[in-house]
Each structure stands twice: as C-alpha cells, then as structure tokens.
Amino acid sequence: MSAKILDGKALAGRLQAEMAAQVQAWLPRVGRPPGLAVLRVGEDPASAAYVRGKERACERVGIASFGRHFSAQDSPAHLLDAIAQLNQDERVDGILVQLPLPPGWDPIPPLLAIDPAKDVDGLHPLNLGRLVRGEPGLRSCTPLGVMRLLQAEGIPIAGRKAVVVGRSLLVGKPLSLMLLAADATVTVAHSRTPNLAEVTRSADIVVMAVGRPRLLTADMVKPGAVVVDVGINRIQDPDGSEQLVGDVDYEAVKERAAAITPVPGGVGPMTVTMLLANTLESYKLRSHL
C-alpha cells in the first residue's frame, strides 16, 4: 500500500490564503502593508529563481517587497550598508540574505548585521539561542515548515523516535531542536555516522537533509515510518534532460512508508510560506497588533 502523500504545496496555498485575509484586516489599523527585503548577491540562476518565487508569494499575500540585488564584484561593505538602512526602515519588517553567497563572500557578517527582530530567516545567533532555550523567537523557515506540515497532517511527534540526517545550521540543527521541543526522541546523523541504514531503520520519523540524490532507499526505512525529504537535487537523465529529485528514493520508499513528502511539492512550498509567516509575526509585534 502506498504512503500518504504529505502535500506541502496544498497546505502552503491554504495558509497563504489565510495570511492574505489577515493582511487585509490589519491594513486599516496599521496604515501600511508588511514589508520584506530579500537581498541577493551575484548571478546564480537558482538563487534568482528562489528570490522570484519569494517575491511572487509576497505579492499573493499582500507583503511589500524591498529587495535589492548586488553584483558579485560589489563590495561586501555595500551589503552591510544596505542592511543597516533596512534595519532602520519602518516599512520593512523582515530582512533576508539569500544564501549561498558567491565565492569570497563571508555570510557571517551580513547575518550578524540583521536586526534580530527582522531576522525572518531565523539565523541570527540571538534567535538560534532562543530556540535552544525554548523561548519565543523567529525560527528557521525550512524546519518550521517541516513541523507545521507534520502537525497539520496530524502526525504524532511526542514519544516518537526521530532521525534527522544532516546537521546544517539551516535545517538539521534547528529541526532537531524543534522535534526535541515537541517531545520526540531525536538522533542526528550525518556523513560520518556509521551504519546509517541501521540508524534510520530505528526511526518512526526520518528527515533527510543532506543534498545527496536518493540516498535513503526502501531498505533503510522501517514499515510505517514517516519520511520527510528536505533535499533538492538536480540530476541528469540518460537522455540529457534534468530532473529534480530529493534525498529519498521516492518511488521505492513510498511503498514502505506510512507517509512521505514529494520533491517538488513537499517541504519547499512550506519553506516559502514560513518566511511569509515570520514576516507577518514581525509585522504584528512591531505594529502592536
């Protein structure tokens, strides 16, 4: 029997419709729409596509965009100057630096320069520290999207064994803390983990976030597990065409798991939607709603 498909695209659409209605209700009280500034450096096509997707999502919800684009040959000081200006701009509730930055650009200074109250990517040390301490704060978008998707689908987390494969600051580390806060028993696996299949087979919930195409095969999943695929990989088919796949061997694993996210259409739309949610949260706090 095939797994239940965890449709992040459908949930994202419903949540964005709710957000659009909220924005319209708040506008008369605040006198301005929420504002998001996405800062992009360089000409990477994937980054440009991601930024366009975020701007389209903002338009659907009613969030004003204050994005800026910098050349890879530009001075990093110009990016820091722009962040300083946006920190003071009352029209802007959220600031995001699109990662990765081009070679030679250190991502740490711009991430540290963002006002934590406008850090809608949840990567400032203050917001990460709040996550560790279990305090309210802006959370990383992809892990937050995973949690919202699991909760919306009614998947139990408390008391379950969860394995997160990947230890990045963007996904693996914050997601493991969010699962722990939801009372899961959490194991974090990575490239140096011996007997990875043995670890993943013990899990009720498996989250893949390593960027390796189809790494998780059916024999690595126990029957009835929930599988969340955060990976996005472009591979070339024998005919030369490109295909977008996750870190999970989807067709095989869906016959063994109880529930699974597709790629595309699973976690990706939820990541963008949580960026909007974080922007609205900052807007609410700054507007005293």
Curated annotation (Swiss-Prot):
Homodimer. Catalyzes the oxidation of 5,10-methylenetetrahydrofolate to 5,10-methenyltetrahydrofolate and then the hydrolysis of 5,10-methenyltetrahydrofolate to 10-formyltetrahydrofolate. Pathway: One-carbon metabolism; tetrahydrofolate interconversion. Belongs to the tetrahydrofolate dehydrogenase/cyclohydrolase family. Its EC number is 1.5.1.5, 3.5.4.9. Pfam families: THF_DHG_CYH (PF00763), THF_DHG_CYH_C (PF02882). It catalyses: (6R)-5,10-methylene-5,6,7,8-tetrahydrofolate + NADP(+) = (6R)-5,10-methenyltetrahydrofolate + NADPH; (6R)-5,10-methenyltetrahydrofolate + H2O = (6R)-10-formyltetrahydrofolate + H(+). GO terms for biological process: L-histidine biosynthetic process; methionine biosynthetic process; purine nucleotide biosynthetic process; tetrahydrofolate interconversion. Keywords: Amino-acid biosynthesis, Histidine biosynthesis, Hydrolase, Methionine biosynthesis, Multifunctional enzyme, NADP, One-carbon metabolism, Oxidoreductase, Purine biosynthesis. GO terms for molecular function: methenyltetrahydrofolate cyclohydrolase activity; methylenetetrahydrofolate dehydrogenase (NADP+) activity. The gene is folD. NADP(+) binds at residues 166-168, 191, 232. It comes from the Bacteria. This is Bifunctional protein FolD. GO terms for cellular component: cytosol.
